[in-house]
Amino acid sequence: MEDIKTTWQKIIADTLNGIAPETCDKILPEQINIETPPNPEMGDVAFPLFTFAKSFKSSPAKIASDVCARLLENEDIKKYGMPKAIGPYLNVFLAKGDLASNVLDKVLKEKENYGKTSSLSGKRIMIEFSSPNTNKPLHLGHLRNDALGESISRILKFCGADVFKVNIINDRGVHICKSMIAYQKFGEGKTPESENIKSDRFVGDMYVAFHKYSQENPEKAEAEAKQMLLDWEAGENKELIGLWKKMNGWAIEGIKETYKRTGISFDKLYFESETYLKGKDQILKGLEAGVFYKEEDGSVWVDLAPIKLDKKVLLRSDGTSLYMTQDIGTAISRHKDWPFNQMIYVVGNEQEYHFKVLFYVLKQLGFEWADDLYHLSYGMVNLPEGKMKSREGTVVDADDLINSLQDEALKKIEENGREKEVGDAAVAAENIAVGALHYFLLQVSPKKDMLFNPKESLSFTGNTGPYLQYMGARISSILRKAETAEGKEKLKDGKLNASLLTNESEWELLKTLEDFPEQVERSALRKDPSALTAYLYELSKAFSRFYRDCPILSGEDADLSYTRMELARATKIVLQNAMNLVLIPFMEVM
């Protein structure tokens, strides 16, 4: 069944074509933008007509008035709703019965597919996120990165895109060598198993130990780390390479456990140790072609004046590469591995300069697909105590944060005496913790810095993940009651009749359900899940008002009770679909 808003797009496009000047191109339904009026008194849906002013050589208000007048001449239009011109907008008061029937039928039929669109069908989108170092566990900053990358991947896929998720593991460099030196000096042959410590935490403890060592012996410690890196790059010290592989293995094993815990996955892992030499040949080709230039000391540079920046070194005077060089090579390799229409890098805003230069250099090298590269920049995430630091060992580890949230959630379950109802209380508490974490991280627009408040995130009331989970469990409980002998008795003669849904709370809930596909599109277009988190909160509030105002099983009218139960069922479907897109575990019981 066609969406009622899509029907109105077609109606308005046809009407515009009927009154357009002969010089105008044919107007297509998808050219008609859709908005929601600021208050219900102005209608249920608004269609701005600004974009047609130039081709019509008329004001948007005049166009809206003419379209409205033409529509009101057609009595058949009224079955879809009543149009009204309000300034440059054509607003529509939708026919409640038809909308209710349309929405319920569509949601109940499409189920987990409700809200999916084909707007990105045929698009191949690669997205890079997380990018951990193998000298320490994931921290709170990674959690924001991971949540953004995974959520946006799911949203883009929901809109029809073929999405390929990649992760570059930073497994080489001086910082990796520092953990290795500490293990050689202080590890005493210990392992994560022997110390009963999560493997990435064990490696991170070595990094902290090196920092303490370097404070006591600064010049010696740094010299040792640099020498170890040279020895590693030479590749001849088998014992050193063995230690590197062992410690990287520990770190990656632990990091993967955290990914599993938070619902994060990838289609391909890249390793810096395999990519760091890439790109040098491309820089030399660019030098030969005159795209880059060489200084007297032999270093190779690019002039960034065309993008209003200074200049950037691409190869050092000794011929060694930089991060920029390897990122150039890695980007080229990825496009060969999996030709994409767009490549999204989810990386903090401190790297904005880096990506401006990277995209420009690739374009200068003749790669047209450089226009399809996008840096999804996001802000710093802090705790109330202040910024995170890693080398001193005062960083907020991802696992520690989740564990503390889980402990608090478990306390609440026990305080409310819900251990028996939720089944495995520890699993339920972890689901609440992950939901609280992801909702809090994703409700803020990526570009903004944010303060993560663990206590606020766990609240079961207000704009939080646990509140959404509670609402899902509440609806599930209502639906279970319908399956009891008493519920079946009350509903046995009932039939679905959407025209009975005339209460204002029912109407608002239906309109909110109908709005879900539009919110998915908005989040995909902006690459910003915060529109969906805001939508989830509005949906939960709309259901709460409906449940308060409209008795489901206590009514005398069997058809009305049955229809309201189906409205609750539809709400659960949309809630589940939306929560999945923003990584919040749905809970049948809380």
UniProtKB/Swiss-Prot annotation:
Keyword Cell membrane among UniProt keywords: no
Motif ('HIGH' region): 132-142
GO molecular function: arginine-tRNA ligase activity; ATP binding
Protein encoded by which gene: argS
Family: Belongs to the class-I aminoacyl-tRNA synthetase family.
Reaction(s) catalysed by this chain's protein: tRNA(Arg) + L-arginine + ATP = L-arginyl-tRNA(Arg) + AMP + diphosphate
SUPFAM superfamilies assigned: Anticodon-binding domain of a subclass of class I aminoacyl-tRNA synthetases, Arginyl-tRNA synthetase (ArgRS), N-terminal 'additional' domain, Nucleotidylyl transferase
Compartments (UniProt record): Cytoplasm
Name listed for the protein in its UniProt record: Arginine--tRNA ligase
Lineage start: Bacteria, Pseudomonadati, Spirochaetota, Spirochaetia, Spirochaetales
Keywords carried by this UniProt record: Aminoacyl-tRNA synthetase, ATP-binding, Cytoplasm, Ligase, Nucleotide-binding, Protein biosynthesis
GO cellular component terms given for this protein: cytoplasm
InterPro entries per the UniProt record, alphabetical: aa-tRNA-synth_I_CS (IPR001412), Arg-tRNA-ligase (IPR001278), Arg-tRNA-synth_N (IPR005148), Arg-tRNA-synth_N_sf (IPR036695), ArgRS_core (IPR035684), DALR_anticod-bd (IPR008909), Rossmann-like_a/b/a_fold (IPR014729), tRNAsynth_Ia_anticodon-bd (IPR009080)
GO-annotated biological processes: arginyl-tRNA aminoacylation
EC nos: 6.1.1.19
Subunit composition and interactions: Monomer.
